[in-house]
Regions:
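SAM/dcSAM-binding transferase cores
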Residues: 91-140
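Generic structural "secondary-structure junction" signal
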Residues: 18, 86, 113-115
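Short, flexible active-site-adjacent loop segments at beta-strand->alpha-helix junctions, enriched
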Residues: 12-15, 61, 103
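Mobile active-site "lid"/loop adjacent to the S-adenosyl-L-methionine
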Residues: 4-8, 13-40
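Conserved Class I SAM-dependent methyltransferase catalytic core
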Residues: 35-92, 96-97
Length: 140
């Protein structure tokens, strides 16, 4: 039975590559991924994307170099990179990346979630306003 192709694939994969495991198989499966499984996942993503399809993924900054290497090997091209900073002092927490099969101009940006004093940044509040039942700016 043939598999369909997708215009958009979004993934929030297990975050830890060869990290310290908890000992709980369910938790470990949800949070950890072996490099060879990561590679197969990228190969399958390439197979399932349409020629103009987009692949969005969020990964910890610590896995960024590995992800770039694997996606390059799988002929997925980076077209957008958003670096997420937890605070103005805690830089490079996560990367949201967008890949495609076609080479395109790279867009690079950053988003800081909280200010040093713990308040949400105006940019974060504006970006996520539709997802909250309360006004985050009121909590600032």
């Amino acid at each position: 039975q043939g598999q369909g192709k997708y215009d958009l694939i979004f993934s929030n994969p297990p975050f830890y590559l060869d990290g310290l495991k908890s000992g709980n198989p369910s938790i470990d499966q949800a949070k950890h991924i072996r490099p060879e499984v990561f590679r197969r996942w990228m190969e399958k993503t390439h197979e399932l994307l349409t020629e103009n399809g987009l692949f969005y993924v969020i990964v910890p900054f610590a896995n960024w170099d590995f992800l770039q290497q694997i996606t390059c090997e799988c002929q997925l091209h980076l077209m957008q990179q958003i670096t997420i900073h937890a605070t103005e002092e805690k830089l490079n927490s996560r990367i949201i990346a967008v890949f495609s099969k076609e080479k395109k101009d790279l867009l690079v940006s950053a988003l800081t979630i909280r200010e040093i004093n713990g308040k949400y940044t105006k940019e974060y509040v504006a970006l996520t306003a539709a997802f909250h039942h309360t006004d985050l700016s009121a909590k600032n």
